[in-house]
Design a protein with these regions (language model features):
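Short glycine/proline- and aromatic-enriched beta-strand/turn motifs that initiate or cap beta-hairpins
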Residues: 2-60
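Extracellular loop and loop/strand-boundary signature of outer-membrane beta-barrel proteins
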Residues: 25, 43-44, 89-95, 135-138, ...
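Residues that define the transmembrane beta-barrel architecture of outer-membrane proteins
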Residues: 33-35, 51-55, 99-103, 126, ...
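Repeated loop/turn-to-beta-strand initiation elements of outer-membrane beta-barrel proteins
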Residues: 35, 66-69, 114-117, 155-163
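Transmembrane beta-barrel strands of outer-membrane/channel proteins
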Residues: 39-43, 55, 71-75, 109, ...
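Transmembrane beta-barrel domains of outer membrane proteins
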Residues: 60, 108-110, 117, 152-154, ...
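Gram-negative (and chloroplast) outer-membrane scaffold detector with strong preference
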Residues: 67-140, 144
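Outer-membrane beta-barrel "beta-signal"
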Residues: 103-110, 184-196
Length: 196
């Protein structure tokens, strides 16, 4: 029996078999539904009228993992201009005309999908996305054609619930203060959405 066992001394190389341990890989449990709906709250800087609280809702449809479309509605109430504050009793707008409401439809692109790590073994799918859209803004008694450019960060807390941090610039032409100019109305929001 001893003569049948090959040895390195006899010129036969010994084969080393590595011990391979198969690792269990758990894929992120992202909901397979393509619709996403939710609400947001934040602040918007209405040009010439200061910053105000803004809130609204969004509905998105994900065509692929990278491309989506979303409809957004938001509302706020403009403050007073510096001219109104300095002049005292002058009111450029009525209370109803100070209501700032926008509707837009945008296309979004998940530019940097990835994961956010919390602790040693907790990872959540995330994505940095860009949006470009157009719509209408009702402000100062007029409807303004509006272009909206934005970016956001989506973090999937569960397979159906996500949080969003977003920034968006609503741009439209206005001649409210005597000269026609392109106004920039920058918005920062925090929101929650659900996939269904």
């Amino acid at each position: 029996a001893a003569a049948e066992e090959p040895t390195a001394a006899a010129g036969t190389p010994q084969v080393v078999e590595p011990r391979v341990h198969r690792r269990e890989v758990k894929r992120p449990d992202i909901d397979t539904e393509n619709f996403e709906a939710g609400a947001f709250v934040g602040t918007i800087s209405i040009e010439d009228f200061g910053s105000s609280v803004v809130y609204g809702g969004r509905l998105a449809y994900h065509f692929t993992e990278d491309v989506f479309a979303e409809a957004t509605v938001g509302t706020s109430k403009a403050g007073r201009t510096s001219y109104e504050d300095l002049s005292g009793s002058v009111e450029l707008l009525t209370d109803s005309e100070r209501r700032f409401t926008y509707y837009d439809l945008a296309v979004g692109w998940n530019a940097l999908p990835g994961e956010a790590f919390f602790g040693g073994d907790r990872a959540m799918p995330s994505s940095l996305y860009l949006t470009l859209g157009a719509g209408s803004t009702d402000f100062a008694g007029d409807d303004h054609f509006t272009v909206a450019v934005g970016a956001g960060y989506r973090l999937l807390v569960t397979d159906w619930l996500a949080t969003h941090l977003g920034v968006r610039d609503h741009m439209f032409d206005s001649d409210l203060l005597g000269e026609n100019k392109l106004t920039h109305n920058l918005q920062f929001t925090l929101g929650m959405t659900a996939f269904f």
